[in-house]
Design a protein with these regions (language model features):
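Ferredoxin-like alpha/beta domains used as RNA- or RNAP-binding modules
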Residues: 1-5, 12-13, 22-77
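Short N-terminal binding/cap micro-motifs at the start of the first secondary-structure element
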Residues: 17-19
Length: 77
């Protein structure tokens, strides 16, 4: 499954293992920026290797605030 901007992903490795995130930007073929609206707000995304992410097949459409993102991702955690 391909990871693109707006994809909902689950972290497979690291201290955030098992948490749901939304991809905010694809930097290159190996790294993306992810956020969850709480520990990683939209203003301060985390850089993550795509090898450590599992795609869920769901995409986020036009979420602009951290609160909206937290509510949307609550179903995945």
């Amino acid at each position: 499954m391909d990871i693109a901007k707006g994809s909902v992903v689950i972290a497979k490795a690291g201290r955030d293992k098992g948490k749901a995130f939304a991809v905010t930007e694809v930097l290159d073929s190996r790294t993306v920026l992810i956020c969850d609206g709480k520990s990683r707000p939209i203003e301060r995304p985390k850089r993550k290797n795509v090898i450590h992410l599992q795609a869920t097949g769901t995409t986020v459409d036009c979420i602009t605030t951290n609160r909206q993102l937290r509510i949307f991702l609550k179903n995945f955690s």
